[in-house]
């Protein structure tokens, strides 16, 4: 009887804990086909890469959606610069696309191997996860010169940079790795199942990461390795952005984008 009571108590705890973890999530958009990357322009308009739809979708503050760009094969990572130029990686066709605010598009860099998540570095270069080669490539957007800034990774899919210029890389293999400017690597992923594309810097020592395998958003202090679970029960969580003190999470399971407070 005592054992059954303990099992029942554990069930009740997990049930309510799961409910609480979802209570602060709000669905802000739906109808996507595998939302993989999320970014915002200077006006607060959200852009979502529609992986299976080969398109990029704009979501206005009133929830209205429109197709911003069509015809990019398996769009994955997305970032937007201060001039509202949009940069997107084509996972299947191995290039980086630039789309200007007036809609003109151009392939600005090619020859990658399944480029997935992308991010701006602290000095304005484009960081690209080269999934199939296990590398992080830095692209100078002026000269278009490529530099390999990290290698020896296991299926890297997401990257972000800390204030001290260290990189933190999420890898579908289960690894989460910090690479210091001197090349030293620290493994951070002991408590992660399968880190996904979404990863963002939230302070000098902390990042938030999609744990795709666990259906969670997790925060980790890169110095202490302390992990805090921010959200759970997310079906096929892949994308993550941090904008105006809110996280935005893209889920493949139901083709939606959710938001939650990041304070």
Give residue spans per PLM region:
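Short loop/turn segments that connect beta-strands within beta-propeller blades
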Residues: 59-64, 99-104, 139-144, 179-184, ...
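A short beta-strand motif characteristic of beta-propeller blades
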Residues: 24-29, 64-69, 104-109, 144-150, ...
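Beta-rich, blade/repeat-based domains predominating
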Residues: 30-43, 71-83, 95, 111-125, ...
